Structure formats: C-alpha cells, structure tokens
Amino acid sequence: MTRDEFRRLTEQGAVLLDGATGTNLQKAGMPVGVCPEQWTLEHPKVITELQERYVQAGTNILFAPTFTANRIKLAEYGLAEQLSSMNRELVALSKRAASGRAFVAGDLTMTGAQLYPLGELQFEELVDVYREQAQALYEAGVDLFVVETMMSLQECRAAVLAIREVCELPVMVSLTYQEDGRTLYGTDPVTAVVTLQALGADAVGLNCSTGPAAMLPLVEAMAEYATVPILAKPNAGMPKLVNGETVFDATPEEFAAAGKRLLAAGASILGGCCGTTPEHIRVLGDAVSGGTVRKPLTKSRRVLTSERGFAEIELDGNFLVIGERINPTGKKKLQAELREGNLNLVRQMALEQEENGARILDINMGMNGIDEKEMMLRTVYEVTSTVDTPLCIDSSYVDVIEEALRIYPGRALINSISLESEKIGRLLPVARKYGAMFILLPLSDAGLPKDCEEKHGIIREILARAEENGLSAEDVIVDGLVATVGANPDAALECFETFAYCKHELQIPTVCGLSNISFGLPERMYVNAAFLTMAIAHGLTMAIANPSQELLMNAAFASDMLLHKADSDNRYIGRMNFLSEKYAGMERVLVRTKGSDQKGGNDSSGAKTHSAVYEAVLKGNKNTIVDETKALLSAGMDPDAVINEHLIPAINEVGALFDCQKYFLPQLIASANAMKLAIEYLEPLLKKENRVEKETIVVATVEGDIHDIGKNLVVLMLKNYGYRVIDLGKDVSAETIVEAAVREQAAIIGLSALMTTTMMRMKEVVEQVKAQGVCCKVVIGGAAITESFAEEIGADGYSKDAADCVKLVERLLG
C-alpha cells in the first residue's frame, strides 16, 4: 500500500480497524507472564481464528500480533535473537487470516526503557531498536505500520524516523492518554498531532486507557489541527471486577453508539482496544457505515511544539517573542561556563525567559573553544527538561542543526535558511525530514539585497525552492532583515514594507531581530521600542528579543491591545498584574546560602524565602544541588534540618504542582532525582541516634507485567521521604511478594500493573496477605487501575501516581 492509496482509503469512508488482541488471547488460555508473541506462535490457530472473525466483522486493517516483538522486550524472555523470524511468522499468520480481504499493519509499541535524560537509553539506540523491528516487518510484507499505545512523544518520534529510514509505507501513530487529557509524560493531543504529522505520520490518534466517551474531547481538539486522518481505538469502557474476573462494561451497541460520535468529532479510522471483540467491531462497522468522514485540514496551522506544549503563530494573532538570551555572543560569563561544560546559566536563562513571557527560545552555541554540536545537543536536552517552551535551533552549521532537530522532542524552528547556495540545498531536506518550520532569511550569495524589490524576489525564490522540497508557505516565517537606521535612514521603512508585503501579499508571518535598528545610537531602548510598536502595526508577527526588557515587552502587549487582537486586553492586564507582583515581592525569593544568616525563612520585606537547595529540588537541578547542600551545611545547618526544612518541603511542593497539572512526569522524575543526590550526600552525616527509622515498604510490578516506569518513580519518591523501600522489580509472583513482606516486616506492600491482563494478579496478593494473616496493608496503582477496583479486590488503598502514593502511605501509617 502506498501513502497515496492509504489517504484515498480514508477519504472513501470510515476505515475499520480490528479490536483487542491481548484480552482475547487471555480468554483463549494465554497465561499471564509468558511472552505473548511466543505463545501466539505456539498456538497459531487462536490468533488466526480471532483475526478471521475480525475480517468477517468488516475490519479493513488487521494489526499483526507483533506488539512487543522488539529487541528490548524480547530480551526480557531471552528471545532477542529470534526477532526477525518471530516478526516474519507473526505477520504470516495475520496475512493468512486476512486472505486478501484486509490490509495487515506491522505493530510496534513502547520498549519499556526510559530515554535519556530521564533514563539511560540514548535516542539513537532507540531508533536502532525500532529500525530493526521495522526492517523485519517490512521484509515480512506488511502493508503499513502502526505505532500504538505510546506514552512518550519522543518514543513516537524515534519509531516514525526508524520506519521512514526503512521504507515509505504508511505509518499510523496512536498514543494513550490519561483522564487529564495528557499522556503520562505530559503531552496533549494537539502537540502530538502537530509534531507527528509534520514528521511524516500518515494518521495520528489515540487508543487504550479509556472508553470512547473520554476520547471525544481529545479527538475534537486534534481535529482542529490535523492534516492527516485521526485514529481512535478505545477500550470497551473501563475494567471492572465481576465474579473474580476483569470485564469491560461497554456492550457492542454502546461502543458503536460512541463510535458514531467519534466519527462526527473527526476520527475516520476506528477500532477497539482492551475488552473489545469481533462483535464490537461488527456493530461499530454497521453504525458508522455511510457516515460522513470529516476531512483533514488542507493547510497546516503554523504551530511549534515541545514535548509538553505548543505555540501557535497566527498571522493576525497576538505578538510572540523568541527569547534570545541563550547565545554566548557578548556574554563572558556564559562563555566561561560553556567552556567548563556547565549548563547552569543556560538553565537559569531558559526559566527566566519563559517566566518573562517568551513563547519560543532561541538556542545558539556558536563560540570558539567548544564542540558546538556536542554543546547544542546537551543544551537541547537540558532546556527541554527544564521548560515547556518550543525551541528555535540557531546555528551556522547544517550538521549542528540536523543533529539537534533529530533529538528534539517536538516540532522546532530553524534559524535560518537563506538563498546561499552552499546551505539551502542541504537545509531544506533537513527541515522536511524532521518536520521543522524555518525562518526565511532574504540573503543570497550576492549578500544583502539592495532594495525591497530584490529582497522580495529572494523571498519568493526561497519559497519556490521550499515547495520543491515538499515544504509549504505554512512552514515559513520571513525575517524582515533589519539594518541599522544610523547607516541607512530608510532601514525601518524598508522593513515595514516587507512586513506588510509578507502579511497582505504572501499571507506569511514575519520575524526580526530588534537590536540592529538602533546600532550606534544613544539610548537604544527607546528606538527599539518605537520600531517594535510601528512594526507590529505594519504586520510584524514576532521578534527575537530579550523578554526581560520590560519596555519592549510592555510595548508589544500594548500594541496588541490597541490593534484589538483577540483577548489582547486581558493579556495586557495580566502582564501588568505580573509586573505588579514581581516588584511587590514574589512569594518565593531565591537565596544563595553563603552565610549563617541565610538559611531560609523571611526576608526584610516579610516575604517567604527558600534556599537554593529548595529551588534545586523544585526545578530538578541535579547540577547544583550537592553544592547548595554543602553551602547550607557550611552555614551551620544540621543535616537533619536540611532534609526536614528544605528537601521535604520542596518535594511536597513538586507533588502539589504535579497534582494541579503544572508539572508532569519528566519534572517529577527530575525533582526526585535531584533530591536523591542530596539525600545520598547527607546520609553518612546524619545522626543515626536521633533519626527516627521509618517503616519498610515492599514494592513490585505484579507477575506477567514487565512495565516499571511508574513503579520505579514510586520507589524513588518513597525513599526520598525516608522510608525503607524493598524493590522486588517487575514480573514478580504473589508468593515472592508476600514472602518478602513477611521477611522484611513490611508495613505496606505496593503493587503496580500497567496492563489490564495483569490486574487480577493484585487480587492474588491481597488474598494471600489475608489468608496468611500478614500484618501488612496493600496499596495498588497503574494505568488501568481505579479506586473502585481497589475496593473490589480488598486493597487498602489506591494511588493515581507516585506523588499521590506518598500521601496515601503517610495517611495509612499516620
């Protein structure tokens, strides 16, 4: 199947996918804890009969049962060397079931390993893992690919890049979302669809985790931005415990009725996940047959993304600032830190610029004495771990830009592409491959254009070259190419003409660097502010500037209000309120503890202050926390006080920010890891005789489940709060868990399960604890777990995440 054929298929009407595989294999006798792919090959009739029933129910696309047949997952069972043969044989089973009546998609999913910087797995290693499986599936003859049940946008990117480096078959990508409408890693559906369609996915959507009703608003949000078809593959409701068995509560008729609503909302590719059966798919197919398919957008909206957010660039929208500070030019302190390999100032600049209103951050590492490529990659990792703001990759070297775009977990902006023959032929394909937008710089080999006519001609020529490379005007922002008014009195007027030309003739947004206009003049800030105000009136969309320069920022907010842009009055008032609070004294003031009089508490204004240790935990800064901890100790503070007065309050605030969805999993992990370093440093210094030993907690992922991201974070958080934690790992039997609890005299057992097929193993642990009379409470959590399920199996508590688990434990042991 070609990509064009796939697109035509989705335009003809609703495309029907298959339903659940795992829950149906389990019903057919597949035990928990075995490798699903190996069991399927040992029982081929089970999968072929199931998939034949799906085809008879009207399925257009079958998912081959290759879900976890990647090297990392297969290695859990000692089967990594059989990867190629297993994928080939599993695809053959699906092709046999399809018998030419349905297409077969090679199925890939998460590896379970955490990517750097949260884990040890490097991005390129993950691409290799997916490329190996994609190559095997391609050679097996799949018609297309699906990357499904994904929680990490960066893992999605790795999979799509890997497939695209193997072949040009269609690729569908589907993520799984939590009740708050975000993935476990904090990605919202708009960010996901924008990033992945730009990268080359042919359909983007969501599956698993919820029933169809909860998916409806997510599909509606995606449809506003999607230039590709949207996929929806919900569970048959949420899992419940009935007569000792896990069941899903949506009947085929209820499921189909919800499917019709998903179709109307914009999902044209529909199927079922956990708990669905061929009957669910048959009734769904009947319900959506002949229904109107909502066509994707023909023109993409101009949107940049990070892993956890997006910035839309609208021709008539509110003015945006690209923060310029992360650039060593003219910054001796930053240059010195970069030469030492220190990114503390970079991190601080990123946070300050985001706080001061920058919607995009420019990253430039161009200086002598460092490896620019290496430092660019390190900076991209550091900044994306610190802030949610999309990035603009700024370098004179094509290879630096390409490497940064490859590892960037979103859709970035390139600064910049000109008509210089040495670079344009290399940069445009790079922008296309990685789905980036770019700043069009109207320069040519001849240098600066002599007038507006020549400048506009260069703009048109670069646009034509971009279209030849598969890009469009929607991928472009034009740089006005600001010259100094001191040397050319018409410089500002020429820029205004270009801004107006791009807005009204080309319908393309514009950007400029402000500082050139006033070069060589006294009191430059006033010239810059006046130029900015006039430029916005002529159509300027965004500027590369320092968001800490309040005169410029305030002028931009006021200009938007005077031009009556959408919600600009509220934005202006919000800006003034922000400044009022800033100068009245923030609730939190950073204090570096150099002396004994700076231990935290209250400053002279009465405002609450916090130590740099507190701030390091709050911001997840592993680079500084040990030094800041040493500074507190040097100031005379007792190690126990450092923990109780600084570390614990800080991690409590992190938990509160996580609860209100201002922080997401990456920030939670970063903060917990930073605190861990401080605890490890302090531990040998603690006064053991005065230290109260906290209770023991045994933690495990239940038998048959090899997912441990959430469990590992729970372990880390509980240890940071001083509990003695015994981590039994993953795929642990009920007997082993209870034995460990008895042996270690545990006060609590904590159980994790990601898959619906392993939930019932939790009930086994609860039953054994009660049967043996073990004096121990049991708490549970995981993606498919609910509070009602915890009550049904007799558990003592349910936690929705790691931060909640700490509160639950303290409440139970209170």
Question: Which positions does each model-derived feature cover?
Answer:
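Domain-level signal for soluble alpha/beta catalytic cores
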Residues: 1-479, 483-814
